Amino acid sequence: MALRAKAEVCVAAPWLSLQRARALGTRAARAPRTVLPFEAMPQHPGNRWLRLLQIWREQGYEHLHLEMHQTFQELGPIFRYNLGGPRMVCVMLPEDVEKLQQVDSLHPCRMILEPWVAYRQHRGHKCGVFLLNGPEWRFNRLRLNPDVLSPKAVQRFLPMVDAVARDFSQALKKKVLQNARGSLTLDVQPSIFHYTIEASNLALFGERLGLVGHSPSSASLNFLHALEVMFKSTVQLMFMPRSLSRWISPKVWKEHFEAWDCIFQYGDNCIQKIYQELAFNRPQHYTGIVAELLLKAELSLEAIKANSMELTAGSVDTTAFPLLMTLFELARNPDVQQILRQESLAAAASISEHPQKATTELPLLRAALKETLRLYPVGLFLERVVSSDLVLQNYHIPAGTLVQVFLYSLGRNAALFPRPERYNPQRWLDIRGSGRNFHHVPFGFGMRQCLGRRLAEAEMLLLLHHVLKHFLVETLTQEDIKMVYSFILRPGTSPLLTFRAIN
């Protein structure tokens, strides 16, 4: 991946095995007590123009996570990174995440994701909270939280997700039992994607799409393809100034806009259905998140559309890939899988009667999801544009600096997680109440944590609960799966898994 062996630390990244990358630690010496100036901070080696040329030539930045992990080893837990924009600092320790939260203002600021914003400006669409900053962000966020993120909201949409998870398990069981051996080996990734679309669509818009156990519609397949193109083109464009990329990558911009057109059309159709139904009669029971937002009318219709679009686009890949990697890790760690199965079976009757109890009666399964996201953080980094000066690792960080927290390296720090290469959900139960609040931050922190976090957690928890009750999950593959960065961190290949029915 590197252009020069000395200038770019990513020279070995494409061939660096995940097993080796997991075991890398931080060899940084203890920082001196005197606060050092920003300019004294170690800097990521290499020429930024060569790096941009490399991204353009390779049509992406697939090994970003390995490159940055290697750089942390060589430079320590903090360094500067120059991509031509504002001052940028990379960190990977929980203590720095905590300091970032402590200095959060009323309007915690993120960098503008230019390709996404450019599309919305060009098409005349509003931005949702993922893309907003300042007072408008806070106004929207405070009115979205009660119906999307609050415990009360979770209690309302969780039974809807549970119904889809049950259907997924039953559809899979039907396929397995059609085989005389009582087992089925398949690439389950497409089915998981259909599940996440179905569950999210039901929770958001109150409508079943018939994707689970049935052949997907052309509209759903087009939506999935559009998401893939959108994420890939985002990486190809996000590291370059628009003034440059519009000239050297016009085809990518065209693909990016066409993908968003498809995504917006999909989401807009869903919202229009709800809007028309509400115009005729007020529902007597809960019919989903978007209906509640429309009924309350605390946000404009355009703002509800904008935020619904972000939730729709952000609720598929980001949930499906952690689910796939959890199933893979449980398949190659059968002892862990059996313990989780026992927990699910013990709680089955209670959860069947009250699906909401899944959030409290499956602590080890919740820990398994934390362990998956430690090893495979679907969002590679968190970011803040700090509003005031602060000190990180004894270096002065001026206001206006972009600070990025790299979760891939945080999760593989042996000083924080002994034997970090080992898949061990129990470690999360062992550290509960130990004050390590910032060891698990895959959904962000503070007021800017992921708005769809609780929906994603419910979808993952319930699917795994129902699958573990009915199937042994096996794999012949013991080797690590190569992960690639494509705006989200995803497996480069999908593992074949065997589902064996439990009598």
UniProtKB/Swiss-Prot annotation:
Changing residue 181 to W: In CMO-2 deficiency; reduces 18-hydroxylase and abolishes 18-oxidase activities; leaves 11 beta-hydroxylase activity intact. Its main location: mitochondrion. It is found in: Mitochondrion inner membrane. It is a peripheral membrane protein. Its EC number is 1.14.15.5, 1.14.15.4. 21-hydroxyprogesterone binds at residue 381. Keywords: Disease variant, Heme, Iron, Lipid metabolism, Membrane, Metal-binding, Mitochondrion, Mitochondrion inner membrane, Monooxygenase, Oxidoreductase, Steroid metabolism, Steroidogenesis, Transit peptide. One of its GO terms (molecular function) is corticosterone 18-monooxygenase activity. Expressed sporadically in the zona glomerulosa (zG) of the adrenal cortex (conventional zonation), as well as in aldosterone-producing cell clusters (APCCs) composed of morphological zG cells in contact with the capsule (variegated zonation). Signal peptide: none annotated. One of its GO terms (biological process) is sodium ion homeostasis. It catalyses: a steroid + 2 reduced [adrenodoxin] + O2 + 2 H(+) = an 11beta-hydroxysteroid + 2 oxidized [adrenodoxin] + H2O; 21-hydroxyprogesterone + 2 reduced [adrenodoxin] + O2 + 2 H(+) = corticosterone + 2 oxidized [adrenodoxin] + H2O; corticosterone + 2 reduced [adrenodoxin] + O2 + 2 H(+) = 18-hydroxycorticosterone + 2 oxidized [adrenodoxin] + H2O; 18-hydroxycorticosterone + 2 reduced [adrenodoxin] + O2 + 2 H(+) = aldosterone + 2 oxidized [adrenodoxin] + 2 H2O. Its cofactor is heme. Heme binds at residue 450. Pathway: Steroid biosynthesis. Residues 1-24 form a transit peptide. GO terms for cellular component: mitochondrial inner membrane; mitochondrion. Induction: Expression is induced by angiotensin II, potassium (K+), and also by cAMP. Pfam families: p450 (PF00067). It is linked to Corticosterone methyloxidase 1 deficiency: Autosomal recessive disorder of aldosterone biosynthesis. There are two biochemically different forms of selective aldosterone deficiency be termed corticosterone methyloxidase (CMO) deficiency type 1 and type 2. In CMO-1 deficiency, aldosterone is undetectable in plasma, while its immediate precursor, 18-hydroxycorticosterone, is low or normal. A cytochrome P450 monooxygenase that catalyzes the biosynthesis of aldosterone, the main mineralocorticoid in the human body responsible for salt and water homeostasis, thus involved in blood pressure regulation, arterial hypertension, and the development of heart failure. Belongs to the cytochrome P450 family. Expressed in aldosterone-secreting tumors and in adrenal glands of patients with idiopathic hyperaldosteronism. This is Cytochrome P450 11B2, mitochondrial. It comes from Homo sapiens (Human).
